[in-house]
Regions:
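Intrinsically disordered, Ser/Thr-rich regulatory regions of eukaryotic membrane-trafficking proteins
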Residues: 1-183
Length: 183
């Protein structure tokens, strides 16, 4: 199975759920040990996952704010809400706009190395889903959206769970395992 781990981070940046999935070593004889099942790595502690979630939350916020803006045409409308001035006063400074004004500004959406691919999905409520998979796995965006749908059904609709609290719901764990292992 090419899915290594799933982390869910609240809008405040705290880790509310993490789960690693069993992987096998290249010989296939027994499960590999270590972070994400990679050889030569150590297993992360719960504290390490908390630090990882907080760090990623900060980096995601920074990358969301450094989305580049390009100079707007002189013929563009002066009341365009996606355009801003360099000095922020609306004076004679040149105008700048986002590359695609109608598209929402996002942070990191995907990151890939030779060992894993990180796919990120941020819901409208600000909850971030981090999915670590094998780099050769196709359609990780569809997979992470399917995970989000099950999260909405089994966690968000649970009357005993409150937003930003840790997720400890057996029905969610079962639905997640069934979705990932029956694909």
């Amino acid at each position: 199975m090419p899915v290594f781990a799933l982390l869910i981070i609240s809008k405040a940046g705290s880790l509310i759920y993490h789960k690693t999935f069993p992987t096998s070593n290249p010989s296939g004889s027994q499960p590999a040990t270590g972070t994400l099942g990679l050889p030569g790595t150590t297993t992360l502690t719960t504290n390490d996952y908390l630090v990882l979630a907080g760090t990623f939350h900060g980096v995601h916020a920074i990358t969301k704010n450094v989305t580049p803006k390009f100079a707007a045409n002189a013929a563009s409308s002066t009341d365009d809400p996606s355009a801003s001035t360099m000095n922020g006063t609306g004076g004679k400074a040149s105008k700048f706009r986002y590359p695609v004004p109608d598209a929402p500004v996002t942070g990191i959406e995907s990151m890939e190395s030779s060992f894993f691919r990180l796919t990120v999905f941020q819901s409208l409520t600000g909850t971030k889903f981090l999915l670590f998979t094998d780099p050769s796995m196709p359609n990780t965006e569809g997979l992470i959206k399917g995970i989000y749908e099950r999260f909405a059904d089994h966690v968000c609709k649970n009357p005993f769970w409150h937003i930003d609290n840790p997720v400890r719901i057996e029905g969610w764990d079962r639905a997640l395992s069934q979705f990932l292992f029956r694909r």
